[in-house]
């Protein structure tokens, strides 16, 4: 895959540029929307949920931002990745290029948006009197795994979308449910231990919790937590690669 990516480096770079420009085409603020969108969502969540869930929670704004930051990246990457094949059918039906390039270009564009939002997140942490420690370097672990997890889910969803167009509506409903099951605006500590363990089945919650442990609690999660995140990522990437390899030759007949 790396050799193929290097061989088509120019095409890949052009796809990333095209996707980024296309997203903000005919907008006045352009890429600034990458910063305003999560900030607006954060503001709404803070106004709505503070009185219900954050009244006695320290650094609740940062707590919300951690959840919103991770979930927004996951949601955007998977939603964009799902349509990556269908949206570029006019290219790969005429030119023989690796189809995963389109998915990777979407993920790189989403990663750029995530990086911009992450800069704003750091500023919010400063305003919220968050203590910066050496543990922040450990955030590279969940970010790296989340990128891979998004790619794996994108491979699965893009393959399914070629054959089943209804998947876009089902995924939209699923992500809405997932948002409420990822403890973005509430704490799982209020639930019984057995219920708290159920949240560990949600990979997105694991990434969110890792961020909060480092940023707010200033602790590094235990080794088993790292292993669980890695396992979820490997499963997603493994299934995604399997589906891509199995159905790759059939995509041309359904787009």
Predicted regions mapped to residue ranges:
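Hydrophobic transmembrane alpha-helices and immediately adjacent juxtamembrane helices
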Residues: 1-255
